[in-house]
Curated annotation (Swiss-Prot):
Protein name, entry field: Chitinase 4
Gene3D superfamilies given in the database record: 1.10.530.10, Endochitinase, domain 2, Endochitinase-like
Enzyme's top EC category: hydrolase
Ranges of residues in domain Chitin-binding type-1: 28-62
GO BP annotations listed: cell wall macromolecule catabolic process; chitin catabolic process; defense response; polysaccharide catabolic process
Annotated signal peptide: 1-27
UniProt KW Zinc keyword: no
Chain's role: Hydrolyzes chitin and may function in reproductive organs during embryogenesis and seed maturation.
Length: 285
């Protein structure tokens, strides 16, 4: 009996060591910053899609104790940051949209309410630092939206149907026959490797039905916020220039398209002025 007990103790101890070694490895591979969850798909975020079922590391929901309590607070709208609704007023939103020509398809498509509906699914947006930082993040988001859509004029990328945005080497999110993954929505999400996981997170088949982004305004804003939270949000502390690099750096930064960079910066500075905050440093890329 003593021998069997010793064997069982050894097995339990060995299993504990194995599990303790596995957890840091998962966190290291995902690389999320503090306060963010690593989803089962390897993306960082703070909503249920990241911190719920399949969460690999970070303050996963159901992990208990302080982490779970903190996440519950964020779900309820507590914590740092400002009320997005109080900053993105009807006057601010329509002030952008009204600069687009009357014949623009986006003018009747994009609405403040659809943005607010989408923002409720991404509680980490503009909600994890100071009030001024939150306002700067909102200003940055809408600066890029303004530039990408021509003051919310465009829903679909100009001549996008003639472009090839299929990365055939990506086997996880394979392109579907007859489907096009050109830019759609507020941030003009493109490529199969973005449509696939965005749809998975939001709740539609992004690979088989990419046109959904141009048909449902709330889903359209959700894809923009999904992209933002996974690719841009984490660099906001580095200045607006870092957000340009995250969105379109390969085509605009390092002198490749100074006109586009200047346009984005000017929109950002204008929106910061409207929100009563300084734009901060490192504005260019």
């Amino acid at each position: 009996m003593a021998a069997k007990m010793a064997t069982m103790v050894a097995l339990v101890f060995g299993l504990a060591l194995l599990l303790s070694a596995a957890a840091p490895a998962a966190a290291q591979n995902c690389g999320c910053q503090d306060g963010y969850c690593c989803s089962q798909w390897g993306y960082c975020g703070t909503t249920e899609a990241y911190c719920g079922q399949g969460c690999q590391s970070g303050p996963c929901w159901g992990s208990g104790g302080e982490a779970a309590a903190g996440m519950a607070g964020r779900k309820a709208g507590a914590g740092a940051g400002v009320s997005v609704e109080s900053v993105v007023t009807e006057a601010f939103f329509n002030g952008i949209k009204n600069q687009a020509p009357n014949g623009c398809a986006g003018k009747s498509f994009y609405t403040r309410q659809s943005f607010l509906n989408a923002a409720r699914s991404y509680s980490g947006f503009a909600n994890d630092r100071t009030n001024d930082d939150s306002k700067r993040e909102i200003a940055a988001f809408f600066a890029h939206v303004t530039h990408e859509t021509g003051h919310m004029c465009y829903i679909n990328e100009i001549n996008g149907a003639n472009m090839d945005y299929c990365d055939k080497s990506n086997k996880q999110w394979p392109c579907q026959p007859g489907k096009k993954y050109y830019g759609r929505g507020p941030l003009q999400i493109s490529w199969n490797f973005n449509y696939g996981p965005a749809g998975k997170n939001i709740g539609f088949d992004g690979l088989r039905d990419p046109d959904k982004v141009a048909q449902d305004p709330t889903i359209s804003f959700k894809t923009a916020l999904w992209f933002w939270m996974n690719n841009v949000h984490q660099v906001m502390s580095q200045g607006f220039g870092a957000t340009i690099r995250a969105i379109n750096g390969a085509l605009e930064c390092n002198g490749k398209n100074p006109g586009a960079v200047n346009a984005r910066v000017n929109y950002y500075k204008d929106y910061c002025r409207q929100f009563g905050v300084s734009p901060g440093g490192n504005l260019y890329c």
